[in-house]
Every structure is written in C-alpha cells, then in structure tokens.
From Swiss-Prot:
It is found in: Virion membrane; Host nucleus. This is Matrix protein 1. Homodimer and homomultimer. Interacts with NEP. Binds ribonucleocapsid by both interacting with genomic RNA and NP protein. May interact with HA and NA. Cannot bind NP without genomic RNA. The lineage of its organism: Viruses, Riboviria, Orthornavirae, Negarnaviricota, Polyploviricotina. It holds the Pfam family Flu_M1.
C-alpha cells in the first residue's frame, strides 16, 4: 500500500458515511494525484462543509496544506488552528511539545506513527497544530504518520461507541437505529438511481420506504416493527441493479 493510499484510508475512516464522504474522497484523490492545486479554494470549500466536526475539518485542512504546493506566505486558516489547539488544555500542549521533539528525530512514516500512537488524540491534535502554525518542522512523511495515528485513535473510539450501540439490548434504540439505516439506504438508492429511464422503480421503492419510516415515527410503532426493513430495501436495490447489469453484493 502506498503512503498516500494509507493516508487516504485513515483520514476517510473518521468521516461520517454519506454523500459528503464521497465528495471528500474525490478531493483527496485529486489532491494526491496533483490535480487540485488551488489550496485557498480547497480550504474555503472545506470550511463551509456541514456535518464534519471541527477536529475532522482541522485534520483534513492539515492534510491539504501538507500536500498542495502553495506560496510560502499563504495565511494559515483560523478554523484549522482552532481545531488543532488540543481544546486549549495546557497538558495537551506539554505532551505535544514532548512528542514533537521525538518526531523531529524520526524520518519514516511508520516510525512516526508508532511513536504517536502512545499519545492521546488531544496531544496529537496539538502537535499537528504546532506543525501547522510553523512552530515546528518535520518531514512530510513524519507529519503523515502523525495524521494517521490521530485518525486511528479517533476511529477506535468511534468504533467502540458504534459497537456499544449495535450491541445494546434496548429495543427502542435498536428500533430507531433500524429506521435510520433504512432511511439512509433509501437516500442512497435515490442517488444511485440517477436519471435513467429504468430508475423510476428504484425511486418509487426508496420513496415508499422513507414515507413508511416517517409514518412509523409519527404514530409510534412497536419496536419490532422495523425488523428487516433495511434488508428488504437492499434486496430491492440488488434486484434493480441486476436488471441494470450492475453486480454489487457488498451492501449487506
């Protein structure tokens, strides 16, 4: 796996699923391929994206700044600086300085990542902030190692939280989660259907599913009534795709 592929993998692991994730993936691919060289426009686009947490925006801004060639005098962006200040916690800053001293002696991506993984996400973000604000200088490989370690820490905590929700025995939470998944699946179906003539059927199925979820929420239904909702939708989607000549078995 190439270095940039690894960086893209780690960064995308902390972005919530949805159309925006696909857009960010495309931007990262363009940046890493050298196709997008307007850093200022890229940062302005990132700043105005909805849904993303300030820290995720900060990390993406850091990656774009590391990768896109820019004039030396280009101003640092406040939204990135604020996200990478470790919540203003002096302990995070102290640890970030210690980590930075270790990283300065390191030259490889994997070496930097190994060192960084023993620090908290707050300290790692602060260390990125030091480098972003030009208070510290490390090689691009080392900076990418720091980025990937930070993303791994964040993805780990997201995974723990997700696992807790999936494993919960509370029927109300499970019911709502199934309805949310069915609703997002329906949205994805509508987007994939696009504007082709054969798309009407898929759009109709998706629209009915969303209306059903809205009705279930409005009237309040038994927690078991949502069982199988998402799977039924996915079966319909796969039937539609086969007719369109698309074989995708990876949704479930």
């Amino acid at each position: 796996m190439s270095l940039l592929t690894e960086v893209e993998t780690y960064v995308l692991s902390i972005v919530p699923s949805g159309p925006l994730k696909a857009e960010i993936a495309q931007r990262l691919e363009d940046v890493f391929a050298g196709k997008n060289t307007d850093l200022e426009a890229l940062m302005e686009w990132l700043k105005t994206r909805p849904i993303l947490s300030p820290l995720t925006k900060g990390i993406l801004g850091f990656v774009f700044t590391l990768t896109v060639p820019s004039e030396r005098g280009l101003q640092r962006r406040r939204f990135v600086q604020n996200a990478l200040n470790g919540n203003g916690d002096p302990n995070n800053m102290d640890r970030a300085v210690k980590l930075y001293r270790k990283l300065k002696r390191e030259i490889t991506f994997h070496g930097a990542k190994e060192i960084a993984l023993s620090y908290s996400a707050g300290a790692l973000a602060s260390c990125m902030g030091l480098i972003y604000n030009r208070m510290g200088a490390v090689t691009t490989e080392v900076a990418f190692g720091l980025v990937c370690a930070t993303c791994e820490q964040i993805a780990d905590s997201q995974h723990r939280s997700h696992r807790q929700m999936v494993a919960t025995t509370n029927p109300l939470i499970r019911h709502e989660n199934r309805m949310v998944l069915a609703s997002t699946t329906a949205k994805a179906m509508e987007q994939m259907a696009g504007s082709s003539e054969q798309a009407a059927e898929a759009m109709e199925i998706a629209s009915q599913a969303r209306q059903m979820v809205q009705a279930m929420r409005a009237i309040g239904t038994h927690p078991s009534s949502s069982a199988g909702l998402k799977d039924d939708l996915l079966e319909n989607l796969q039937t539609y795709q086969k007719r369109m000549g698309v074989q995708m078995q990876r949704f479930k």
